[in-house]
Amino acid sequence: MKLHEYQARDILARYGIPVTGGGVATTPAEARTIAEQIGGRVVVKAQVFVGGRGKAGGVKLADTPEQAEQVASQILGMNIKGLTVEKVLVAEAITYEREIYLGAIMDRASRRIVMMASAEGGVEIEEVARTNPEAIVKVAAHPMMGLLDFQARDLAYGIGLTDGRQARQFAQIATALYRAYMDVDASLAEINPLVVRADGSLQALDSKIVLDDSGLFRHPDLEAMRDSSDEPEAEQRAREAGITYIKLDGNIGCMVNGAGLAMATMDVVKLYGGEPANFLDIGGGAGKEKVKTALQIILSDPNVKAVMFNIFGGITRVDEVAKGIIAALEEVNTDVPMIARLVGTNEEEGRRILAESALIPAATLAEAAEKAVQAAQSR
């Protein structure tokens, strides 16, 4: 789950990371009020989940509250890469001498939280990694003790912050960012840029936090911050139904119960020369309504040329899955071929229910994948 910049900066501020003064506005009048409270030059920034806001005209400076109101009226309602701007962040505009990148991310190779810093701040870190990887300094936090003081200092020295006061403040900010990352169950937390001001102090100008959806049950306050404006309708509907769905680029829709089985199913589809259109896990104990919703989500993708069901009934009853498939087909008019491999609890009843339908039966996963690939290729 992505957070807007203003939401991320509020979290950073709670951990003692210095951020610029300001607030979020939904109307030009609110933007003017915030600018009056700041009492100086401000920057008005569109709050949308896309990059390149500045180039699209979504970030503008204002010297007076009146200008802030005018600029906000121009940005609010603007369409940036398909997203409508509904909120703007009005923040203090400051001068600075240097931009730094600082971020925390899970590194699956080392199975550690890795803190990254770069002297090349203000640009996408992926671009720095591609063009000048030597400019990125990394340290892996200890899995039990977290980010240690000497590691935070190593980051500072690694990007050229040799002044003792600056290095100490940077280390404090890095440690605070790590704590925030861990406490909110984030998958990414970054400050870009973290700037060095004329007096040598550091301040966070822009920030980004992405939360791990699997940890949101521990954070109802953060879940309440969700903005689904950039979330595809199918994924939003799946989330609300308790279905794990990720759209892919292939043409074979897959409905499976269990994440491991779903990944194995996709592998076998690839083995037989096909391309999965999605990852979809209906979970354990799915009833017919959930199955119906899942099938409707799969069929909402116009690229789907065949649908493959791979259900292993343990907690999930095969007959309930079969009822859900039939119920969905009664509501969705489609000629997409469907292949079903259903085994486990009440499988005989499930097969009986499907026997009168147009579904193509399969006894094994390999057979189901092969038939699905053939069906998709024939269309």
Swiss-Prot record:
Residues 9-237 form the ATP-grasp domain. GO terms for cellular component: cytosol; succinate-CoA ligase complex. Belongs to the succinate/malate CoA ligase beta subunit family. GO terms for biological process: succinyl-CoA metabolic process; tricarboxylic acid cycle. Pfam families: ATP-grasp_2, Ligase_CoA. PANTHER family: SUCCINATE--COA LIGASE [GDP-FORMING] SUBUNIT BETA, MITOCHONDRIAL (PTHR11815:SF10), SUCCINYL-COA SYNTHETASE BETA CHAIN (PTHR11815). Its EC number is 6.2.1.5. Keywords: ATP-binding, Ligase, Magnesium, Metal-binding, Nucleotide-binding, Tricarboxylic acid cycle. It comes from Roseiflexus sp. (strain RS-1). Substrate binds at N257, G314, I315, T316. Its cofactor is Mg(2+). This is Succinate--CoA ligase [ADP-forming] subunit beta. The gene is sucC. Succinyl-CoA synthetase functions in the citric acid cycle (TCA), coupling the hydrolysis of succinyl-CoA to the synthesis of either ATP or GTP and thus represents the only step of substrate-level phosphorylation in the TCA. The beta subunit provides nucleotide specificity of the enzyme and binds the substrate succinate, while the binding sites for coenzyme A and phosphate are found in the alpha subunit. It is an enzyme of class 6 (ligase). Heterotetramer of two alpha and two beta subunits. Binds 1 Mg(2+) ion per subunit. HAMAP family: Succ_CoA_beta.
